Design a protein with these regions (language model features):
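RNA-contacting regions in translation and RNA-metabolism proteins
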Residues: 1-165
């Protein structure tokens, strides 16, 4: 996976009605949660990227990003309701997504080393599809191990095994 492109906010007067409605919807959610936030929106034809800032952003991130993922899901449902073409919605705050991706890549490499050292498969904890994809991608070029996912949602997890020599 390539590193994410730097965020560039779209000026307010250039935002589409869809982007403004998405921002207002998300502002309503954060206010109801008691976490006031400012939201910058970067808009392309395929995606709305929304970056939240303010105090107490850790509340919006939640445990392993679960709250942020839930807010992203709800905002995406709201944005895409009644639309013919799907518009991808991504949320971030305090550069959480990039930090989490880097932490997952380091974890993948540590667990691959463990598999090589012990000669046994390593079963990772359950993760969402996005995080599993990061692990698979991180180890794709590794000559010693291979990865696959097992289980059913929400308990689907990555398994790291030695490549057959």
């Amino acid at each position: 996976m390539e590193p994410a492109e730097p965020f560039v906010a779209t000026p307010e007067d250039e935002l589409s009605d869809t982007a403004k409605n998405a921002r207002d919807f998300l502002l309503g959610l954060t206010e109801k949660m008691g976490v006031p936030a400012e939201i910058a929106v970067g808009e392309t034809a395929e995606q709305l990227k929304m970056v939240l800032s303010g105090e107490s952003m850790s509340i919006l991130i939640g445990r392993r990003g679960e709250t942020l993922d839930a807010l992203q899901y709800l905002t995406s449902l709201n944005v895409n309701r009644g639309r013919e073409e799907y518009l991808r919605v991504s949320l971030d705050t305090e550069n959480y997504r990039a930090k989490r991706e880097e932490a997952l890549r380091r974890l993948a490499n540590r667990m691959a080393n463990r598999a090589v050292k012990t000669g046994r498969k390593v079963v990772m904890e359950p993760m969402n599809p996005y995080e599993r994809r990061i692990l698979h991608s991180a180890l794709q070029q590794n000559d010693a191990v291979t990865t696959h996912s097992e289980g059913e949602e929400p308990n689907r997890h990555v398994v790291i095994t030695l490549k057959q020599q």
